[in-house]
Structures are given as structure tokens and as C-alpha cells.
UniProtKB/Swiss-Prot annotation:
HAMAP family assigned: MtrD
Transmembrane spans: 7-27, 60-80, 88-108, 142-162, 168-188, 210-230
Compartment(s): Cell membrane
Name of the featured protein: Tetrahydromethanopterin S-methyltransferase subunit D
Pfam families: MtrD
Keywords from the named record: Cell membrane, Membrane, Methanogenesis, Methyltransferase, One-carbon metabolism, Transferase, Translocase, Transmembrane, Transmembrane helix
Described purpose of this protein according to its UniProt entry: Part of a complex that catalyzes the formation of methyl-coenzyme M and tetrahydromethanopterin from coenzyme M and methyl-tetrahydromethanopterin. This is an energy-conserving, sodium-ion translocating step.
UniProt-listed InterPro entries: MeTrfase_D
Topology versus the membrane: Multi-pass membrane protein
Broadest EC class assigned to this enzyme: translocase
């Protein structure tokens, strides 16, 4: 493979990294406090939740790629498959968590970072238990999580497409794509610095810095990947 043929996959990987980093900022993560229903979001770490959705999307994209190839239409189908797979995984995760919060713990889903849910227009503050920063997965957080999952699936699928275009075997491309996703998810996690409720959270404004960091890291990852196949 010559340098010219490697430029397009390099650009695709750089864009994919930026998309993945942005996607993580949409996902409602409450960390350890959420596991005790004292913080809004799903009770796990930012990287783990984002990576789980991304890996599911990556598997969906890989299965689709094996059937449709890497034509322009095929690439679109691969990215759609990645997005839908990620959305299903994260949607089910948030739903099961919600059922446990509501019927197990007995708390009302309420967001701490907004007075009124931007989607349902329901008031939030009256339902936040004193001493907590919200609990459960309110509608705005659920929708934000689905958006983040879709973006993460698209980013992971695009990275897989780029690696396949470099001539790597599906298995090798899949392993590298997993590592690639973790790199960008961790960068986003450091940028967030703890928990985040979704696109309505003030921490969401930090996203541009994370995207810039992931763009640089993804470009470096892409250059190394290209050098591997030259």
C-alpha cells in the first residue's frame, strides 16, 4: 500500500476518534454514588459504560461488514449497524438500571443539573432527595445516552472501516478498534472528571477540549497503523 491510499483511512480514524470522544460526554454516568442511588445516571464508570456500548456497536459493525463489504453504501450500512447496536445495548442497560432504582430502591428519577427536564418539561428539583445529586435515569438523561451510544457506535464502526481499508484482517482490525475505542473513551473520562448527566450538564461544555485531545491521539494512532501495513 502506498502513502496516498493510506491517507483516507488516516483521516477516517482521526474523525472517528473525535466522534467517540464527543459521544462519551452524552452518556449519563453516575459512578459509585449512582450505584447507591445518590447520583443521577447509571452506576458505573464513564469508560466502562461507553466502552460497553462501543464494543457492542463494533461487533454489529463487524458482522455487517462481513456481509456488505466496504462500498460507499456498505460503509453507510456498517455505521448504521454500529449505531443501532450501541443504542440497543445502552438503552437496555439504562432501562434495567431504571427498574432497579424505581422498584428496588424506591426513588423517583430526577436530574440534579436542571430545574426542568428539557424534554418532558417536568420539574426535577422537588424530587431530588436532600443530600443527593439526583437519582435514577430521567428522560433527558435517557435520550442523551441514546444519542451518545449512536455516536459511539458510528465512531467505532468508522474506525473499524478505516482499519479494514488498510488491509488488516477482520480479527486484527477488531482488536485494534477495541484499543482505539478505549484510548478515546479514557481521554473523554479524564476530560469529564467524574460524573455527568448528559448534554444538559455544565460539564458538557468541556467537550471541545476532549475532542481536540482525541483528534491528536487518533491521528497518532492512525499514523502508527499506517506504518504497520506499509
Amino acid at each position: 500500500m502506498d502513502i496516498v491510499s493510506a491517507i483516507v483511512p488516516l483521516i477516517e480514524m482521526t474523525i472517528a476518534g473525535a466522534i467517540i470522544n464527543a459521544s462519551v460526554h452524552f452518556i449519563p454516568v453516575g459512578g459509585a454514588p449512582a450505584a447507591m442511588a445518590t447520583s443521577t445516571g447509571v452506576g458505573t464508570g464513564t469508560t466502562q459504560l461507553a466502552a460497553g456500548a462501543g464494543f457492542t456497536g463494533l461487533m454489529g459493525a463487524a458482522v455487517m461488514a462481513s456481509n456488505v463489504g466496504l462500498s460507499p453504501i456498505g460503509m453507510a450500512l456498517i455505521m448504521i449497524s454500529g449505531a443501532v447496536s450501541s443504542m440497543i445495548m445502552l438503552g437496555v442497560t439504562m432501562l434495567i438500571g431504571q427498574l432497579i432504582y424505581v422498584f428496588g430502591v424506591g426513588v423517583v428519577p430526577a436530574a440534579d443539573k436542571c430545574e426542568i427536564d428539557p424534554i418532558t418539561k417536568d420539574p426535577q428539583k422537588p424530587y431530588v432527595t436532600p443530600g443527593t445529586t439526583g437519582h435514577g435515569v430521567p428522560t433527558v438523561c435517557f435520550v442523551s445516552g441514546l444519542i451518545g451510544a449512536a455516536l459511539g457506535g458510528i465512531g467505532g464502526a468508522l474506525a473499524y472501516i478505516a482499519l479494514r481499508k488498510l488491509g488488516l484482517d477482520p480479527g486484527v482490525a477488531g482488536m485494534l478498534a477495541v484499543g482505539f475505542f478505549f484510548i478515546n473513551a479514557v481521554l473523554a473520562s479524564y476530560n469529564i472528571g467524574g460524573t455527568i448527566e448528559g448534554f444538559h450538564d455544565p460539564k458538557f461544555k468541556k467537550m471541545p477540549n476532549g475532542v481536540i485531545a482525541s483528534t491528536v491521539a487518533s491521528l497518532l494512532f492512525g499514523i502508527i497503523s499506517v506504518l504497520m501495513v506499509l
